[in-house]
A protein has these predicted regions:
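Electropositive, glycine-dotted interaction segments
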Residues: 116-250
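Short acidic, glycine-rich loop/turn motifs
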Residues: 7, 11, 110-116, 137-139, ...
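Generic structural "secondary-structure junction" signal
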Residues: 15, 97-99, 132, 180
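Beta-strand secondary-structure signal
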Residues: 4, 18, 107-111, 120-122, ...
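Pre-Walker A-like glycine/lysine-rich segment at the N-terminus of P-loop NTPase domains
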Residues: 2-71
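Conserved P-loop NTP-binding catalytic core
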Residues: 41, 47, 61-120, 126-127
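Conserved ABC ATPase signature
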Residues: 44-51, 247, 251-259
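Pocket-edge structural micro-motifs
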Residues: 21-23, 180, 256
């Protein structure tokens, strides 16, 4: 589960921007809030809104770029041909309309949860080169906090459950340490837990592609259909039911029923 994402100096984003899924301490809609095993509350849905050209899509693109920065080296070393399409390189570009920020690094900070722990991952990148990287963990069962690793330009420090792991003296300065650990220690339980979230815990859908958006509605789940109908009705549209059909040519048709 995504808890919080912060980015600074990325494309149209100059100052620090945070996308937060933590629920505010209010009594309204308590039945819709997700409650963690440790009592922390999270929103089931959130939205980024603003004028056209305001940089909304760049917030999500920043998150996508961070995820791909970590996963791409793992995909490159995989023998699975089916994931080749997922190896697209996303360039991490700084805010270009300022003579200072264009030469400054891009900063990412990510909080996310798995079934076992909450993690904080920080990555600072300048022209694809890793300037700083850090990973911390909080066990959900015990609440125990621990640092797992920290990396800067001068040294790499493996801590806690990672203390006995080894790194190469020739580790590339463009390769995230998290990616390196995923390649070298793929059977380590904590490494698998972290990278499992990056690989399967978050998906990116391009709503600029109407065909991809329609495919979301193809789901055979009645629960998904009811949720979509509820969202449509909350927008004051007169659609009370819909049916989606996909023909042999992979084309999609949507039939709607109105009041």
């Amino acid at each position: 589960m995504l808890c919080q994402f912060t980015v600074k100096n990325f494309k149209s984003i100059r100052e620090e921007v945070t996308f937060d899924m933590q629920a505010a301490a209010i009594s309204e809609h308590e039945d819709r809030v997700i409650k963690g095993t440790d009592g922390e509350l999270y929103l089931p849905v959130s939205a980024v809104y603003g004028p056209n050209g305001g940089g909304k899509s760049n917030v999500l693109e920043a998150l996508h770029s961070l995820v791909m920065k970590v996963l791409r080296p793992l995909y490159a070393t995989s023998n699975n041909e089916d994931i080749a399409i997922r190896m697209k390189k996303l360039i991490i570009e700084p805010f270009a309309f300022d003579k200072e920020t264009i030469n400054e690094p891009t900063e990412f900070e990510l909080f996310f949860r798995t079934a076992l722990a909450e993690y904080r991952y920080e990555l600072i990148v300048k022209k694809e080169v890793i300037e700083y990287e850090r990973l911390d963990r909080i066990k959900l069962e015990t609440g125990r906090k621990s640092a797992l690793f920290e990396r800067d330009k001068k040294e790499i420090s493996l801590k806690g459950t990672f203390a006995k792991l080894k790194t190469s003296d020739e580790l590339s300065d463009t390769l995230p340490l998290l990616s390196y650990l995923g390649i070298t220690y793929s059977k380590n339980d904590v490494v698998r837990d972290v990278l499992g979230w990056f690989d399967e815990g978050i998906d990116f859908l391009n709503y600029g592609n109407p065909m991809q958006e329609l495919r979301m509605a193809v789901s055979k789940s009645e629960d998904v259909k009811r949720l979509m109908l509820q969202m449509i009705q909350e927008m004051d549209l007169d659609i009370i039911d819909f049916r989606v059909e996909e023909n042999e040519n992979d084309r999609i048709e949507v039939f709607t029923k109105h009041i």
